[in-house]
Amino acid sequence: MKIKNIRNTKYEILNTNQGFTLIELLISLFIIMLMTALFLSNYSAGTRANNLSLGAQQMAEDLRTAQNKALGSTQYNSSFPKGGWGVHFTTASTTKYAIFADASGDKTYQTNEMYQITPLPPSIVITGLSNGSAQSSLDITFLPPDPIVRIYNGTATSTTGYIYLKNTVTGTTAQVKVNILGLIQVN
């Protein structure tokens, strides 16, 4: 059996082009760009879909804020508002709504009673208001100590109010429901 002397053996590296070719580089870049485009398109579609849920939940939270301000007897301009706290919705302004202190006690929103204007997320609009029939405006107020819930359309109160929202990009809809007991639901 012959053993080769390993110490004196020379290893020769063949001179072959060991780099990337232009075609390989272009294919790699194409794959990376394709993966990035797929990720970004799915990400923005998911964001658009979440905007409706976010808008409806924010609206319900703002209704609860008005309810809590009434329960907590929160003052507005150094006195408790006679009509409590409320939220004003109108189809004339479909991208925002107002939290207000009903200082006059008339169950309706006046511009001098405005506490906060809340804009809806991008592409989300109020498509309708209802208290049993379609309305152009709806004021939901909470009067302590119970709090008494008043769902007022400018002429009469009702037992349930609905605010309908729509995502103008995806076409999906949601509804926020408030009843006379103060229960606020998002569907």
How would you name each of these model-derived features?
Residues 158-167:
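Short conserved beta-strand and strand-loop elements enriched in small hydrophobics
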Residues 104, 146-154:
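Long, compositionally biased, intrinsically disordered regions
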Residues 81-144:
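Type IV pilin-like appendage domain
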Residues 170-187:
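Low-complexity, S/T/G/P-rich flexible repeat/linker segments used as non-globular hinges
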Residues 17-44:
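N-terminal single-pass transmembrane signal-anchor helix
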